[in-house]
Structure formats: structure tokens, C-alpha cells
């Protein structure tokens, strides 16, 4: 009796014919095309732009002084006192980036805390003073921001970078001339450290104490010497000699 071909043997035999090879090749090509198409589809879907979170959009707008976007976000309920991922509040960030238009929009919002500080204890006025951003400092003062604070102050920061115009403005608004940092460093010491002769003179003329020392026993002249600022050393030495002569001249004559 002849063996009756089974279904599996029939398919196996057919696969070894030229027609069978062509059929299998066509199937494989079809599968490959489908897989390739699927891969491209995955790549395409994976490359679709991800919508930025509102907070990220707000932070970017603050950095680039995009006041329209900031106003839009605020109108939609964004917290003007929110911080970035480094803990920096929006107003402080605006001051750091000199984003004056955004600064105006933020302080115009009644919910904004103009005294808010970052993790380092710095507020917007301090960074505006450090950057020499007079308009930002004026904006904050107009909104009632304090020119004095415990520890480091805006006057320290303005003096550190020799921004005489801001030093003058802060003094006009009753900035404490001999404010002490946590270790007793004064604005005059910061001016001396940076070699800012005109700033040191400005502070001295406003009543800064040239003899005051910080917690490690350094005065302004010591700072100038330590940081190798010869012009400041010369100016402070001359001022000290002048003061000594005045004191000697005002002393009562010995009987």
C-alpha cells in the first residue's frame, strides 16, 4: 500500500520546490517590512515632542525675561513664589538673570513675597545689588522691600562688586552702614576685599567705621592687604592717618 502523504509532509515537500522557496521568501520579506514599519512607527512616536510642564515653562520664561509668558502663567494661577529645582524662588531668579520686566510682573502680583530667599539666604534685592541692576533695586524698594536684613545685606553685595550708584541709593534708604555678616564682615570690608577704592571712600564718607573688626580680628585695611589691593591699602592707610591726626588735634592739651 502506498503511503498517503500527510499534511505536514506535503508542506515540507512544497517548501523545497522553486515555487515554495519563492513563496517563503515573499512571506519573510512581508514580515520584515511589517517589522521595519513597526520600528519606524515606534521611532516616530518616540520622537514626538513632550509638552513641557507649566512650572518648567514658567522658569524658562523668567530666565529669558519673557514677560508675556509669565503674565499668562500667573493669570492661570501659577504661584509667584514657586521655586526652581534648586530651590530658587522666581523673584530671586529674575534678579539673578537681570530679567527686569519679569521682575515687574512678579512684584505687581499681590501674592508675591518680595522678601523671599533662596537656600543660601539671598533675596532678590541682594542679587540685584550684586549685579548692579539699579532698576531692579529701585523696583523692589518701591514695592516696600527692606534694604536691611540680618546677616548679609544688599549693601554688602553692592559694595563687593563696587556698584557705587547702588551703594548710594541703599544708604539714601537708610541701609545700615556697618551691617555685620554672620562673622562680622562689613560692607567696607567687602569693598576693600574687591579693591573698590571709590566704594570704600563712599562708605567712609557716609560714616563707616574703618577700625571695626570681624570675628577673626580683621578690619578693612587687613582685607585690602590680604587680597593684595595696593590702591585700596594706600587709600585706607591715608584715611586712618588723617583720622589719627584729627583725633590728636582735638585732644585737650596736657597741663
Give the ranges of each region predicted by the language model:
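Ankyrin repeat boundary signal
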Residues: 82-83, 114-117, 146-150, 177-180, ...
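Conserved ankyrin/ankyrin-like repeat signature
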Residues: 69, 101-102, 135-136, 165-166, ...
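Ankyrin repeat domain, specifically the short helix-to-loop turn at the C-terminus of the second helix
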Residues: 71-79, 104-113, 138-145, 168-176, ...
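Ankyrin-repeat-protein effector appendages
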Residues: 2-27, 47-60, 143, 173, ...
Amino acid at each position: 500500500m502506498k503511503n498517503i502523504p500527510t499534511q505536514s509532509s506535503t508542506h515540507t515537500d512544497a517548501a523545497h520546490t522553486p515555487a515554495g522557496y519563492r513563496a517563503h521568501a515573499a512571506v519573510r520579506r512581508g514580515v520584515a517590512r511589517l517589522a521595519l514599519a513597526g520600528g519606524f512607527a515606534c521611532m516616530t512616536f518616540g520622537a514626538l515632542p513632550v509638552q513641557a510642564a507649566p512650572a518648567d515653562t514658567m522658569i524658562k520664561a523668567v530666565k529669558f525675561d519673557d514677560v508675556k509668558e509669565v503674565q499668562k502663567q500667573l493669570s492661570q494661577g501659577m504661584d509667584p513664589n514657586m521655586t526652581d529645582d534648586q530651590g530658587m524662588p522666581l523673584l530671586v531668579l529674575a534678579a539673578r538673570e537681570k530679567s527686569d520686566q519679569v521682575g515687574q510682573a512678579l512684584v505687581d502680583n499681590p501674592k508675591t513675597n518680595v522678601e523671599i530667599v533662596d537656600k543660601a539666604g539671598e533675596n532678590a534685592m541682594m542679587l540685584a545689588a550684586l549685579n548692579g541692576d539699579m532698576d531692579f533695586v529701585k523696583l523692589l524698594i518701591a514695592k516696600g522691600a527692606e534694604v536691611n536684613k540680618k546677616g548679609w545685606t544688599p549693601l554688602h553685595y553692592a559694595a563687593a562688586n563696587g556698584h557705587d550708584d547702588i551703594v548710594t541709593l541703599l544708604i539714601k534708604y537708610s541701609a545700615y552702614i556697618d551691617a555685620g555678616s554672620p562673622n562680622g564682615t562689613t560692607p567696607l570690608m567687602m569693598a576693600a576685599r574687591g579693591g573698590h577704592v571709590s566704594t570704600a571712600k563712599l562708605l567712609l564718607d557716609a560714616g563707616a567705621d574703618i577700625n571695626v573688626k570681624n570675628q577673626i580680628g580683621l578690619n578693612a585695611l587687613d582685607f585690602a592687604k590680604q587680597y593684595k589691593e595696593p590702591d585700596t591699602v594706600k587709600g585706607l592707610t591715608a584715611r586712618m592717618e588723617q583720622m589719627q591726626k584729627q583725633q590728636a588735634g582735638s585732644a585737650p592739651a596736657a597741663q
